[in-house]
């Protein structure tokens, strides 16, 4: 086997050196329309890893990235009341849901994931599409469960922010408080 990041020989998903590098992310904050989106890596740093979600080995890559970034966040996060980590459109594709993998590591006192609660009714792919296309083709999110606590939105990447903002607006229209979003990578970096 080879390290998914540097391609050196290893029996694990990442070699020891890359595991150490990836387990020390540099958080970035982007604000869109007054809404904060926290990312752990610049897109340019982990582009190949992000695109692995379209293959079966992406499951192992996402599990490790979630452990390196999201789990570490969950350990340091505290909030006095119950909060849900809500993966955006956590439908199973390619054998797993990459957003569900990320949200699953967000477990701590008063923080737990809620699955299959917000799905897009549109099947259009945004991959490689520009802002105009994204604005003209909304996801049309549907809330599938009763949500009784504030939400942290979870996704793998923020590009233009249209998906995250549309998810936020859908939830807020239903009276659900959305605190912020967590993503692995920000495409602006």
Please describe what each predicted stretch is.
Residues 10-11, 22:
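Cys/His-rich microdomains that often coordinate metals
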Residues 153-167:
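A phosphate-binding catalytic loop at a beta-strand-loop-alpha-helix junction
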Residues 16-82, 92-93, 117-148, 182-189:
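Active-site-facing substrate-recognition patch
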């Amino acid at each position: 086997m080879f390290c998914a990041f540097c391609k050196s020989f290893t029996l694990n998903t990442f070699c020891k050196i890359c595991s150490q590098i990836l387990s020390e992310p540099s958080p970035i904050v982007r604000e869109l329309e007054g809404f904060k989106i926290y990312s752990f890596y610049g897109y340019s740093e982990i582009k190949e890893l992000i695109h692995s979600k379209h293959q079966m080995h992406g499951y192992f890559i996402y599990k490790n990235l979630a452990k390196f970034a999201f789990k570490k966040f969950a350990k340091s996060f505290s909030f006095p009341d119950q909060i849900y980590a809500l993966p955006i459109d956590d439908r199973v594709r390619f054998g797993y849901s990459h957003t569900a993998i990320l949200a699953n590591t967000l477990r701590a006192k008063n923080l737990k994931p809620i699955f299959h609660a917000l799905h897009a009714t549109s099947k259009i792919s945004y991959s490689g599409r520009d802002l105009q296309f994204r604005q003209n083709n909304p996801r049309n999110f549907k809330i599938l469960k009763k949500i009784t606590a504030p939400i942290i939105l979870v996704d793998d990447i923020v590009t233009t922010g249209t998906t995250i903002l549309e998810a936020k607006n859908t939830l807020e229209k239903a009276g659900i408080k959305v605190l912020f979003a967590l993503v692995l990578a920000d495409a602006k970096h």
